[in-house]
């Protein structure tokens, strides 16, 4: 396999983002977290706006997009919205490169924090983010926006008994 390159997503990349997300989410089948397997992916209009705003970075191998990362805002904080890598290209450092790139760009932009929500019991979720400096945000420290995300995800069927918010302090 050739090496990968990271670049800002382009409009022509949008159609493959959902299929990459669905393929990556298949890993959850073995964990019992089947709510991620409902087939729902980033809506096309959301992807369009994110691409136009420069908020999606893709990883490309031999001209094929094999992974992507989305950053959004959660109130005053930058939020890691999605990281997806095709399983056929997993464990090659692509996800780590996407994450490190987002951290570097956030710092360069003067962001103070980067937050996310993830599963606490899945090896490629909470422990992976912790290795990159993210720490669990205790519920009593959740922002109103974190509480709103939690409630919206619960309403969508996501079990928050094993889900957490995490934060990386950048500045």
Question: Where are the model-predicted features located?
Answer:
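Conserved GNAT acetyl-CoA-binding A-motif
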Residues: 106-119
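Conserved N-terminal entry element of GNAT/NAT acetyltransferase domains
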Residues: 1-15, 164, 169-171
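Conserved acetyl-CoA-binding loop of GNAT-fold acetyltransferases
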Residues: 130-138
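Conserved acetyl-CoA-binding loop-helix of GNAT-fold acetyltransferases
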Residues: 85, 91-104, 131
């Amino acid at each position: 396999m050739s090496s990968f390159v990271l670049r800002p997503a382009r409009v022509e990349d949008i159609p493959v983002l959902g299929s990459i997300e669905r393929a990556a989410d298949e890993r959850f089948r073995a964990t019992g977290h089947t709510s991620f397997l409902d087939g729902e992916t980033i809506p096309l209009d959301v992807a369009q706006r994110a691409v136009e705003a420069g908020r999606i970075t893709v990883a490309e191998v031999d001209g094929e997009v094999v992974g992507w990362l989305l950053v959004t805002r959660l109130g005053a904080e930058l939020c890691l919205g999605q990281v997806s890598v095709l399983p056929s290209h997993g464990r090659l450092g692509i996800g780590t490169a996407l994450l490190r790139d987002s951290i570097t760009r956030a710092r360069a932009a003067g962001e103070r924090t980067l937050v996310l929500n993830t599963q606490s019991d899945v090896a490629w979720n909470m422990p992976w983010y912790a290795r990159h400096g993210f720490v669990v945000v205790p519920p009593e420290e959740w922002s109103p926006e974190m509480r709103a995300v939690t409630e919206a995800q619960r309403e969508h069927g996501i079990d928050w008994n094993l889900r957490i918010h995490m934060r990386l302090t950048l500045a």
